[in-house]
A protein has these predicted regions:
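Sec/Tat signal peptide C-region and signal peptidase I cleavage site
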Residues: 19-23
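Bacterial N-terminal signal peptides
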Residues: 7-17
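N-terminal secretory signal peptides that target proteins for export/translocation
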Residues: 1-4
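N-terminal intrinsically disordered, low-complexity segments enriched in P/E/S/T
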Residues: 24-170
Length: 170
């Protein structure tokens, strides 16, 4: 066995292990499965980094609750999660922009100077239950839509990424 074979197998195993877990069957009950990847570019102080977050790690961040309805749901719902700004502060990221990706490669770009930026919530539960993939989970970026008209625009709706699995900080 050559070293190239060992490197290829090691990379394949690491890719499998480091890939966020999106199995509908496990319904994200495993709090230690990776559900979100966050990449941060290199700075003068550090190299580029990729952070893997488990559901337990997200729940360890300050929790925020929004009671709101959405254009995709019929009733008032209670969304619990971590604000995007709190997640980025936890990894000392200072974004010029943020791109949020869904498992189907839908993406939305966030501008930190935009009004309402601080209210983007990475929701991990709705009405006290985890969200399976078939119900826009396991992670869904939501806003307090009915708190203010500024959250009821096509632009904000387009940033409401469900099935969130990756964030690229630029």
């Amino acid at each position: 066995m050559g070293w190239r074979f060992v490197v290829k197998i090691s990379f394949l195993i690491l890719s499998f292990v480091m890939t966020p877990a999106y199995s509908e069957e496990n319904n994200f009950g495993n709090q230690n499965a990776l559900v979100l990847e966050v990449s941060v570019p290199a700075t003068e102080e550090r190299t580029a980094l990729v952070f893997g977050f488990t559901m337990a790690m997200l729940k360890a961040l300050p929790e925020t609750v929004y009671k709101t309805s959405t254009v995709w749901t019929e009733e008032l719902n209670e969304f619990k999660g971590a604000r995007l700004v709190d997640l980025l502060a936890a990894i000392d990221a200072r974004p010029k922009s943020v791109i949020a990706w869904a498992i189907n490669d839908y993406m939305a770009e966030f501008d930190p100077t935009q009004e309402g930026w601080n209210e983007a919530l990475i929701a991990y539960s709705v009405n006290g239950k985890p969200m399976p993939v078939r119900e826009k989970g396991p992670l869904w970026i939501v806003f307090p839509y009915y708190e203010s008209p500024k959250f009821r625009s096509d632009y904000i709706y387009s940033q409401s990424v469900w099935q969130l699995n990756r964030i690229d900080v630029e």
